């Protein structure tokens, strides 16, 4: 079966590098599915789970936003923050969500509001990714 090379990197480290049969991730306009030979594309990524189907099975990576570049034989995910699926911490995500909701209640400027909304979106997406991983196991 045809494959496409996938690199998922954050500012801190390379999270995944290898060949895949299929990649699914949350694009700015909705869920994207990438197969080998896909038309070139550059778009922003929303917080959520990147699902990478390899010959050996599925890999999950949580991204907190970033940029996606697709070429016919190569996919690059430049993530603001990326965490391997098995490294996600539900307690930390719940605490981050609670803190963001509290910040929304106590915001004093438009900047505080925007920051709190962004943090809430990331925490909520992280919890959804954790729930999705649990269903797969």
UniProtKB/Swiss-Prot annotation:
Alphabetical list of SUPFAM superfamilies matching this protein: Epsilon subunit of F1F0-ATP synthase C-terminal domain, Epsilon subunit of F1F0-ATP synthase N-terminal domain
Pfam families with a match to the protein in the record: ATP-synt_DE, ATP-synt_DE_N
Transmembrane segments annotated in the record for this chain: none
InterPro entries: ATP_F1_dsu/esu_C_sf, ATP_synth_F1_dsu/esu, ATP_synth_F1_dsu/esu_N, ATP_synth_F1_esu_C, ATPsynth_dsu/esu_N
UniProt KW Kinase keyword: no
Keyword terms, alphabetized: ATP synthesis, Cell inner membrane, Cell membrane, CF(1), Hydrogen ion transport, Ion transport, Membrane, Transport
Localization annotation: Cell inner membrane
Superkingdom of origin: Bacteria
GO MF, one example: ATP binding
Predominant location category: membrane
Protein's membrane topology: Peripheral membrane protein
GO CC annotations on file: plasma membrane; proton-transporting ATP synthase complex
Its biological purpose: Produces ATP from ADP in the presence of a proton gradient across the membrane.
Entry similarity comment: Belongs to the ATPase epsilon chain family.
NCBIfam families in the cross-refs: ATP_synt_epsi, PRK00571.1-4
Entry-linked HAMAP family: ATP_synth_epsil_bac (MF_00530)
Quaternary structure and interacting proteins, as annotated: F-type ATPases have 2 components, CF(1) - the catalytic core - and CF(0) - the membrane proton channel. CF(1) has five subunits: alpha(3), beta(3), gamma(1), delta(1), epsilon(1). CF(0) has three main subunits: a, b and c.
This protein's name: ATP synthase epsilon chain 1
Species this chain originates from: Ralstonia nicotianae (strain ATCC BAA-1114 / GMI1000) (Ralstonia solanacearum)
Organism lineage: Bacteria, Pseudomonadati, Pseudomonadota, Betaproteobacteria, Burkholderiales
Name of the gene: atpC1
């Amino acid at each position: 079966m045809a494959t496409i090379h996938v690199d998922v990197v954050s500012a801190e480290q390379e999270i995944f590098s290898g060949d895949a049969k299929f990649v699914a991730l949350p694009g700015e306009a909705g869920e994207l599915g990438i197969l080998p030979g896909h038309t070139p594309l550059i778009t922003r990524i929303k917080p959520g789970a990147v699902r990478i189907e390899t010959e050996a099975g599925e890999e999950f990576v949580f991204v907190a936003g970033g940029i996606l570049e697709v070429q016919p034989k190569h996919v690059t995910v430049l993530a603001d923050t990326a965490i391997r699926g098995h490294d996600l911490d539900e307690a930390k995500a719940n605490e981050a969500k609670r803190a963001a909701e509290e910040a929304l209640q106590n915001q004093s400027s438009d900047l505080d509001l925007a920051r709190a909304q962004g943090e809430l979106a990331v925490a909520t997406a992280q919890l959804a990714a954790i729930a999705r991983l649990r269903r797969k196991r």
